Amino acid sequence: WGCLRLPLPLCHALAAHCRCPASHTLRCREPLTVSSLSALLLGAHRPTDVIIENQALLTSLTRDDTRMLWDLRHLTISNSGLQYISDDAFQDNHRLSHVNLSFNALTSLSWKTFQHLPLQELTLEGNPFNCSCGIRWLQLWQNGSRAELGNQSLLCWEGSMLVALDSHPLHDCEPPTARIEHPDVVLRQGDSVNLTCHIWGEPSATGEWVLPHVGSEPSVTKLSEWELVLEINNISSSLNHKDLTCRAENSVGLAEDSVMLNVTFPPVILLLSEAIPQHFWCIPFSVDSNPTPRILWLFNGSMLPEGPYIHTRIVEYEPNSTVLHGCLQLNRPTHVNNGNYTLVVQNPLGRAARSIQGRFMDNPFSFSPEEPIPVSISPLGTRNSSLEGPVETADEHTFGVSVAVALAVFASLFLSVMLIALNKCGHRSKFGINRSAVLAPEDGLAMSLHFMTLGSSPVSSTESKLDGLKSNFIENPQYFCNACVHHVQRRDIVLKWELGEGAFGKVFLAECSHLLPEQEKTLVAVKALKEVTENARLDFQREAELLTVLQHEHIVKFYGVCTEGDPLIMVFEYMKHGDLNRFLRSHGPDAKILDQGQGQPCGQLTLSHMLQIATQIASGMVYLASLHFVHRDLATRNCLVGHDLVVKIGDFGMSRDIYSTDYYRVGGRTMLPIRWMPPESILYRKFTTESDIWSFGVVLWEIFTYGKQPWYQLSNTEAIECITQGRELERPRTCPSEVYDIMQSCWQREPQQRSIQDIHSRLQALVKTPPIYLDILG
């Protein structure tokens, strides 16, 4: 059989005179062995290339012969007896692009046979065509070099003379024309329309109207050989933006003219679904209207004002349609946004409305944070139950004053006794009393802001078995200068939406009244504690005291706490651009890829911008080092970006949830950011201000790689091996050598050789005179 790589069923199905020299190729060359293509391919696999030559018995080709060749791309029938090809011979061969019909017995050939094909090459040399209107289309194609016909020498018989087709005049053989005479086609739903089509051609042309589904039955009237009138009554909105086409054709070719109807109608709500969580929450809807409708929303029956955080977004326009697909987009909605949402669409012709319930989260409070907190008063006597409220008597007033005075005297005596006792107990320390900060068991990184540890805090296996890790704080006016934690009234806090969630609880964007004297309302980030155990409350209190101490322009500002009821709340300043890692990625060269083409493109950070960011973080680190505070988790994910590229150190405790791949779990609960840790911290769990400097070097590397993960090509175990063996991160392509030298200064093997003051000074110098950097690797 001589078959190579062809599926076995095809080889068995072919006649013995055909060959399959390549996969999916059929070749029949032995003379007088093929009379029908359909019989040859019966029951066979479908080839993509068919080559038939020297077959005088093969005289016709119809749709029945080719209907099973769905994958046919190349067809050759040459040196055969082919005389006739039907108009629909290739109706089912939508991939056919190369046709060779050379040296057959074709005297005529219709353009209709090839009109729907993606034809790249049509070979017709050696056929005895008659010079007639039936091959005028070939002359036009040849003169226009379509389907490679311009490179062929086609001949036709004019009587007994064989002439060149491309230059032979074929009289009275022209393609038809079609023209729709139409009035103003802006119609209202329910109107009627009459359209007249004028057709012409030589030889004479036939005409027809090609219509979409129009609902009511259209009427077509033939006024003459040249005029067709279309009448449609009770126009439907489904005809809006639909084409009505008049088609004329003759033996030379085809002509069409179309008109698009513009049907106006009142708005219709096609879809309104329940809210679905995406990167944001979306209440999806679809509406249809012409003209374009006004879209607005009601929330619990009142007008919903739209802004940057709640707004309507059209996500898709259907081509040649008035249907709009969109959603009401809610960024980080909270329980405040739960309620009834009504979509209202209207245009000059009418109005439509539909409602749906939206529920985004449960109320994290036992009461509405927008309402005043009820204060319960234990009755000291008979209360007035009238609507005017309680009436205070003179006796009650005298009694109240007496109680207040007695309490004040008692408090003074108690404080005096406590001070004497403290002085006696503390005589062994020349600095005074000791204070301890207890971290969560087995998790030195459990606190949301890691300013809990002073100086060095090595973690041993023995200590990990204790109930908590204790570090002694030296009494110093800088640390505990009678720091008074500011208390914020819960009624002054109005939650807007959730920013994120961590192991401790949730962080919300909120609006706080009376927080700053120069502003009536201030946007803040609110951290709500999930646990309400006694240990959690103690940790909350200690953290609040420490955060109150930290006051620096590049440390996230702590405003205070709210302890009225549950949950316990910490209030921080709000940094509008979020964490630095995402900010770097969205302003880097791969921003469009990471965003998947969505959203507005951000400008790419320059060398000057990156140096400014690094210097600000270094400034915050100098401040922490001066207080001997150890951060323990310094990374771009734990820095926040505000207005005008202001960068501050801070961490709301969400990073271990959002950036979980940046942490390595040790034992049961401990999550360590090993890619940012120096060898002494990995090997001995020793965290110092010097270990923070190592982490700062990695932060520099993150900045100059636009937020890439350190050692991103390695697993956590492989990264640990590289760090402990002394390998360093490679210099980023966008990083000048002067900056890489600073990184390497942070990665000195000996901790005492790392100096944050020196690093900060060098960065400040680079900001003033940025290095000239040429990207020779790019």
From Swiss-Prot:
Report the record's Gene Ontology biological process terms: axonogenesis involved in innervation; cell surface receptor protein tyrosine kinase signaling pathway; cellular response to nerve growth factor stimulus; negative regulation of cell population proliferation; negative regulation of neuron apoptotic process; nerve growth factor signaling pathway; neurotrophin TRK receptor signaling pathway; positive regulation of ERK1 and ERK2 cascade
Q: Which residues cross the membrane?
A: 401-421
Active site, per annotation: 633 (proton acceptor)
Q: Where is this site: Interaction with SHC1?
A: 479
Interaction with PLC-gamma-1, annotated site positions: 773
Give a yes or no for keyword Transport in this entry.
no
Binding of ATP: at which residues?
499-507, 527
Alphabetized InterPro entries for the sequence: Cys-rich_flank_reg_C, Ig-like_dom, Ig-like_dom_sf, Ig-like_fold, Ig_I-set, Ig_sub, Kinase-like_dom_sf, Leu-rich_rpt
Query: How is this protein situated with respect to the membrane?
Result: Single-pass type I membrane protein
- How is it regulated at the activity level? The pro-survival signaling effect of NTRK1 in neurons requires its endocytosis into signaling early endosomes and its retrograde axonal transport.
Which transformation does this protein catalyse, written as a reaction? L-tyrosyl-[protein] + ATP = O-phospho-L-tyrosyl-[protein] + ADP + H(+)
The protein's recorded glycosylation sites are 100, 130, 143, 151, 194, 234, 262, 300, 320, 340, 384
Q: Which PANTHER family match?
A: HIGH AFFINITY NERVE GROWTH FACTOR RECEPTOR (PTHR24416:SF370), TYROSINE-PROTEIN KINASE RECEPTOR (PTHR24416)
Regarding protein family, the annotation reads: Belongs to the protein kinase superfamily. Tyr protein kinase family. Insulin receptor subfamily.
| Name of this chain's protein | High affinity nerve growth factor receptor
Organism, per UniProt?
A: Gallus gallus
